[in-house]
From Swiss-Prot:
Reaction(s) catalysed (UniProt annotation): (S)-4-amino-5-oxopentanoate + tRNA(Glu) + NADP(+) = L-glutamyl-tRNA(Glu) + NADPH + H(+)
Source taxon at top rank: Bacteria
Notes concerning its domains: Possesses an unusual extended V-shaped dimeric structure with each monomer consisting of three distinct domains arranged along a curved 'spinal' alpha-helix. The N-terminal catalytic domain specifically recognizes the glutamate moiety of the substrate. The second domain is the NADPH-binding domain, and the third C-terminal domain is responsible for dimerization.
Residues given in the record as substrate binding sites: 53-56, 111, 116-118, 122
EC number: 1.2.1.70
Family to which this protein belongs: Belongs to the glutamyl-tRNA reductase family.
Function of the molecule: Catalyzes the NADPH-dependent reduction of glutamyl-tRNA(Glu) to glutamate 1-semialdehyde (GSA).
Subunit structure: Homodimer.
Keywords: NADP, Oxidoreductase, Porphyrin biosynthesis
Name of the protein: Glutamyl-tRNA reductase
Organism in which the protein naturally occurs: Bordetella avium (strain 197N)
Site annotation Important for activity: residues: 101
């Protein structure tokens, strides 16, 4: 059975954050998941890679096409979910659609922030994890190498990333909606990853009254805080100190909420009900969604920011058209490469069969020469034997065929076995 490129998963357009957080995979769980996927399907899934970010969880496979319908069931089972609850949010892509999707994702065309560059790095991390897990083979390796090349081509030849509103900039805008000038705002960042670093950069440009970084690893918190003359604190101190802050931006890799309803409710009472902006960029979420019901708290999720960053998309519509044209050309190129791979075993088989005939006829000729036969007679017998073997296959196929099959064979014969007329 031929191997197909398959992709399935969900993203910010097909599933809300409440669903995405249930299938999100931290980096340390990706390799075990890949091992479980290949084990569940045996040889039917030859290669696999998993891309899991705040906005998407996707699985790319080189697999037998017959298992395509069972793959989403595995994803649901892996996360202890009912397949029916996940099914409405999933997309399943096959062959050129899967290839096109990979190219679009890496190029930023499928991102919440159109043209954002972070997704390319995240996809490279996913490929690295698959390589380390031993689940990347020739087909997916070629797919992702071409994916990265396409993303570079799109970004260098179009303005897909120009004039975009980043998630970090959107976070600042949301805080400004509540407080106006942020010059007097005390800002807390929970986490110390790339997204928090971007947010800290944008907030620092507004010169807030103070900035503090809280992170599980003190060394990383101090490193980030040092760039912005910010303070640091332990996550364990959140309960006591949360009330100090007007703006809280959180993005960690925690599998459970860090800020619960009770903790935030106590903080609002200590603040005497002064407003608090809380921006949760994590998937799974760092802040319990029930916090948004509190009168004095303005809670925004990653999806809320996504709606804000859609502004400016119209201005980049021409760049999108250019990018899609580049991608379509490269999709066709990859599919041609895949089709050429399917021919390779046939060509090898033909060469091997021809070499076997050649070896047998040469051995027969040597025996005849050893017995004293004249070289001229041996050469004639060698030529005759090769001719008979050459013609045996096609003539036997013609003799066995009938009707439409015979018509097709007759039509192909001049191309497969060009005669004197075809060389004129």
């Amino acid at each position: 059975m031929s191997v197909a490129v398959l992709a399935f998963g969900l993203n910010h357009t097909s599933a809300p954050v409440s669903v995405r957080e249930r299938v999100s995979m931290p980096v340390d769980l990706v390799k075990p998941a890949l091992a479980g996927l290949r084990s569940a399907f045996g040889g039917a899934v030859r290669e696999a890679a998993i891309l899991s970010t705040c906005n998407r969880t996707e699985v790319y496979c080189a697999a037998d096409a017959a298992v395509a319908e069972q793959l989403p069931i595995w994803l649901a089972d892996h996360h202890c979910m009912e397949a029916g609850s996940l099914h409405p949010h999933l997309y399943r892509l096959h062959q050129n659609d899967a290839v096109r999707h990979a190219f679009r994702v890496a190029s930023g065309l499928d991102s919440m922030v159109l043209g954002e560059p972070q997704i390319l790095g995240q996809m490279k991390d996913a490929v690295r994890a698959a390589e380390e897990a031993g689940s990347l083979g020739t087909l997916l390796h070629q797919l992702f190498q071409r994916t990265f090349a396409v993303a570079k081509e799109v970004r260098s030849q179009t303005e897909i990333g120009a004039h975009s509103v980043s998630m970090a900039a959107a976070a600042v805008r949301l805080a400004e909606r509540v407080f106006g000038d942020l010059g007097q705002a005390r800002t807390l960042f929970i986490g110390a990853g790339e997204m928090i670093e971007l947010c800290a950069t944008h907030f620092a440009a507004q010169h807030p009254r103070s900035m503090v970084v809280a992170n599980r690893t003190a060394e990383r918190a101090e490193s980030l805080a040092g760039r912005f003359s910010a303070g640091t604190m332990k996550l364990a101190d959140l309960t006591e100190r949360l009330a100090e802050f007007d703006v809280v931006v959180s993005c960690t890799a925690s599998s459970l909420p860090i800020l619960g309803l009770g903790m935030v409710e106590r903080a609002t009472r200590q603040r005497r009900h002064r407003p608090m902006v809380m921006i949760d960029l994590a998937v799974p979420r760092d802040i319990e969604p029930e916090v948004g019901r509190l009168d004095d708290v303005y809670l925004y999720s990653v999806d809320d920011l996504g709606r804000l960053v859609q502004s400016g998309t119209d201005a980049r519509r021409a760049a999108v058209v250019q990018a899609e044209a580049i991608i379509e050309t490269r999709v066709q190129g990859f599919m041609h490469w895949m089709q050429s791979r399917e021919v390779v075993p046939v060509i090898r088989g033909l060469h091997q069969a021809a070499e076997d005939v050649q070896a047998a006829e040469l051995e027969r000729a040597r025996r005849l020469l050893a017995r004293g036969e004249s070289p001229e007679a041996v050469l004639e017998q060698l030529a005759h034997g090769l001719t008979q073997k050459y013609l045996h296959g096609p003539l036997a196929a013609l003799n066995r065929s009938a009707g439409d099959e015979r018509k097709q064979l007759l039509a192909w014969m001049p191309r497969l076995f060009p005669g004197r007329d075809s060389r004129r």
